Amino acid sequence: SYGQLGSTHHSIHDVAVLRAINNLNIVIPCDNFETQEVIKSAVNYSEPLFIRFGKKPMLKIHNENQSFKIGKGIKVKEGKDLVFIATGETVQRAYQAIEILEKDNFKCTLISMHTIKPFDEDLFLQSIKNTKGIITVEEHSESGGLGEKCASILAQKKIITNFKVIGFPDEYMVNGSQSDVLDYYNMSPKTLAEIAKNLIS
């Protein structure tokens, strides 16, 4: 979803555009396991399916015994202090942020929300019960993506909580490597951990 030739090669609005298309399902796998499973599922899937792949090799998040279904997110970690909802390659960064937070005795939940549409509202609502805060992380514009979807559910359900959307702002992005750009826009594991602490302290 990314190239180093400037803003024209930064695919950060695709989810927002495609979410508006009727019956089009959107999946963003976070590791090799999710990638393999969504490809296998896509063969016999009855509706149009958009799969967004990252460019670089991804770290292993899931074990091979994990179940996978389009439209059903996966709980990677569980803790009561804060919930990270992430998708695609940002799941790995959220995972690393949680490892930093665990050193300070914070216990966090991590949801790999690989399917943006249809969205797993049941898992989202179940995961945020009794938590102190929610952070969404996505390699996408803050408009029209994962964070905005979560915000709309919170508003419709009249849930008041500490909530933070982390993505790309409404501006032309800086140029650099994928890692450098994500770090610049507050998606380094260290910065995510700091944001989490500030959100719930």
Model-derived regions: residue spans:
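Conserved thiamine diphosphate
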Residues: S1-N44, I195, I200
